[in-house]
């Protein structure tokens, strides 16, 4: 087990402004030691000959290619709009201009 004791946990609790009882300090010392040991074993598992990866298997883009299809002209897009200005949709202001 990792060398994390009750005093280390109490110090971390003080730094984090967390109040912990004696029982909580003891239990947390054991739990943190297990976590540190687990992280240590994972870091030892990957050797220097293993390249860093973001995914365990190679991924390719599974989505379709972007293909330009039928598009509207500005006039067609704005034809059903209640109001427009300079080929843009005109909407009520939602923020004050200061």
From Swiss-Prot:
Transmembrane annotation, as ranges: none
Official protein name in the record:
Aspartyl/glutamyl-tRNA(Asn/Gln) amidotransferase subunit C
The cross-references to HAMAP family, in alphabetical order and at most eight, read: GatC
Any GO BP: regulation of translational fidelity
Q: Which reaction does it catalyse?
A: L-glutamyl-tRNA(Gln) + L-glutamine + ATP + H2O = L-glutaminyl-tRNA(Gln) + L-glutamate + ADP + phosphate + H(+); L-aspartyl-tRNA(Asn) + L-glutamine + ATP + H2O = L-asparaginyl-tRNA(Asn) + L-glutamate + ADP + phosphate + 2 H(+)
MF GO annotations: asparaginyl-tRNA synthase (glutamine-hydrolyzing) activity; ATP binding; glutaminyl-tRNA synthase (glutamine-hydrolyzing) activity
Q: Which family does it belong to?
A: Belongs to the GatC family.
Q: Which UniProt keywords apply?
A: ATP-binding, Ligase, Nucleotide-binding, Protein biosynthesis
Superkingdom to which the source organism belongs: Bacteria
Assembly information from the UniProt record: Heterotrimer of A, B and C subunits.
Give the top-level enzyme category. Answer: ligase
Stated EC number for the protein is: 6.3.5.-
Give the species. Paenarthrobacter aurescens (strain TC1)
| Purpose of the protein | Allows the formation of correctly charged Asn-tRNA(Asn) or Gln-tRNA(Gln) through the transamidation of misacylated Asp-tRNA(Asn) or Glu-tRNA(Gln) in organisms which lack either or both of asparaginyl-tRNA or glutaminyl-tRNA synthetases. The reaction takes place in the presence of glutamine and ATP through an activated phospho-Asp-tRNA(Asn) or phospho-Glu-tRNA(Gln).
InterPro entries, alphabetized: Asp/Glu-ADT_sf_sub_c, GatC
